């Protein structure tokens, strides 16, 4: 007799095979309208069994102990309820790095890798660059830059001590030396902030409060509000970042900022109108949406 997906009778069955678990979980996730249900089931089971997805299908008839199967059903249940896969796994992949995530930080997005790409281009000719990641969250951008440029001196700040704890744990896990400190983008630039950076990079909160209800529940309910929302003024943090760029970047230094697609032109105009800022550009992500505003400060002129 076929039991309803997720029923007590199903979860109580002893020693199911790997393939049976995947099939049942995929049906359960599909019924809940979760994206990529089969792939999600594979990821969860592979994580639980500490193997890769290919290994699951190399031994599809291998049985799974009842206790492990029950744990798997609980993991699937969390995803059915809408919890992000990365929270269930406890980590996210970003720029080839495995990073811890928790409800204290925003899950790193694949599109933010475009920010890292542009940032690396901006400092490719700079020997031993000094970098500042303002609003680091999980540390994903700072750590990716340090991983790709071991010679860089990377500093990173966040207003949240809980987020900084996650970022520091990620740095320790990866063996990467990034200097973290507490700092509020909208307050005075902290004394601990380096004032001679070759690159300032930031992915600040940029979603207007009015758009909150239009966000997918997996974002609205699980990412911290402070990482998402800019309040009534979607340019609030970019106005602050103008001050940070002015205070922290060396002449000829670069800044790379992730932006809301609908406000990219406004952010570009904001920086174009700032004294001491040179060329400013908007760059699209792989989906063709404006994703980055970047530019350079003016080089010092010989007197």
From Swiss-Prot:
The keyword Methyltransferase applies. Belongs to the protein N5-glutamine methyltransferase family. PrmC subfamily. Substrate binds at residues 203-206. S-adenosyl-L-methionine binds at residues 135-139, 158, 203. GO terms for biological process: methylation. The gene is prmC. InterPro entries: DNA_methylase_N6_adenine_CS (IPR002052), HemK-like (IPR004556), N5-glutamine_MTase (IPR050320), PrmC_N (IPR040758), RF_methyltr_PrmC (IPR019874), SAM-dependent_MTases_sf (IPR029063), Small_mtfrase_dom (IPR007848). It catalyses: L-glutaminyl-[peptide chain release factor] + S-adenosyl-L-methionine = N(5)-methyl-L-glutaminyl-[peptide chain release factor] + S-adenosyl-L-homocysteine + H(+). Keywords: Methyltransferase, S-adenosyl-L-methionine, Transferase. Disulfide bonds: none annotated. Methylates the class 1 translation termination release factors RF1/PrfA and RF2/PrfB on the glutamine residue of the universally conserved GGQ motif. This is Release factor glutamine methyltransferase. GO terms for molecular function: nucleic acid binding; protein-(glutamine-N5) methyltransferase activity; protein-glutamine N-methyltransferase activity.
């Amino acid at each position: 007799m076929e039991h309803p997906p997720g029923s007590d009778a199903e979860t109580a069955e002893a020693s199911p095979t790997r393939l049976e678990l995947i099939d049942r979980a995929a049906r359960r996730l599909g019924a809940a309208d979760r994206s990529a249900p089969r792939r999600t089931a594979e990821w969860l089971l592979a994580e639980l069994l500490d193997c890769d997805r290919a290994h699951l299908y190399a031994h599809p008839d291998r049985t799974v102990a009842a206790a492990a199967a029950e744990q798997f059903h609980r993991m699937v249940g969390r995803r059915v309820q809408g919890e992000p896969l990365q929270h269930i796994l406890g980590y996210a992949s970003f720029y080839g790095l495995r990073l811890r995530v928790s409800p204290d930080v925003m899950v790193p997005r694949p599109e933010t890798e475009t920010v890292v790409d542009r940032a690396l281009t901006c400092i490719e000719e700079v020997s031993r660059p000094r970098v500042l990641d303002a609003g680091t969250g999980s540390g994903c951008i700072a750590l990716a830059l340090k991983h790709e440029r071991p010679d860089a001196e990377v500093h990173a700040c966040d207003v949240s001590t809980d987020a900084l704890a996650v970022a520091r744990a990620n740095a320790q896990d990866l063996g990467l030396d990034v200097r973290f400190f507490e700092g509020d983008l909208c307050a005075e630039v902290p004394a601990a902030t380096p004032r001679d950076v070759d690159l300032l990079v930031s992915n600040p909160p940029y979603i207007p409060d009015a758009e909150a209800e239009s966000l997918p529940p997996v974002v609205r309910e699980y990412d911290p509000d402070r990482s998402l929302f800019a309040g009534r003024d979607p340019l609030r943090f970019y106005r602050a970042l103008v001050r940070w760029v002015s205070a922290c970047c060396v002449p000829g230094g670069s800044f790379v900022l992730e932006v809301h697609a609908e406000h990219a032109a406004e952010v570009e105009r904001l920086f174009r109108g700032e004294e001491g800022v040179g060329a400013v550009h908007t760059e699209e992500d792989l989906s063709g949406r404006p994703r980055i505003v970047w530019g350079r400060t003016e080089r010092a002129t010989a007197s």
